């Protein structure tokens, strides 16, 4: 497995594995169950400039594919793209595959997320 150029820009946490051409968010431990992985930008994105009172503007594009690790078992949960205070960036161990890798108890500072939820919770 070679180093992909994306690793110059992002860091993996949890069960992330980097393969040339893609990032597998749950593939590092080869266990598709109860697995959570996260990548984050190496450089902090400032959303507000307090000196100029200006908000930041940015664009992002990516493609995603949520596929089963085992052909007869459908993928569960999904993934989320989110903006978060760097102090809250640790992958919570107690989540064990649920919650789309989002932080616990972030209500005091808040965060913005777009979820791609693939699991119907009854």
What label would you give each PLM region?
Residues 1-122:
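Polar, low-complexity loop segments and adjacent catalytic/binding residues used for recognizing
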